[in-house]
Amino acid sequence: MDSEKIAQTLVELRGARPRAEVATALGVSVSALAMYETGDRIPRDETKRKIAQYYEKTVEEIFYA
């Protein structure tokens, strides 16, 4: 699992959506989402599933591609 690649994917998926909007939808703090998007933290499995569902992708597509 390459944290830089995951971070880049998450930023690309979020696009122009405000970080606060996505964080609220996922049930995480804005700072946690920011850490995922900078590669400073990898989300837990449950959060990975929420992220995948939100972006209509699979966990594998986002985190293991």
PLM regions: where:
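Phosphate-coordinating loops and pocket residues in cytosolic domains that bind phosphorylated ligands
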Residues: 35, 64-65
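DNA major-groove recognition helix of helix-turn-helix/homeodomain DNA-binding modules
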Residues: 46-61
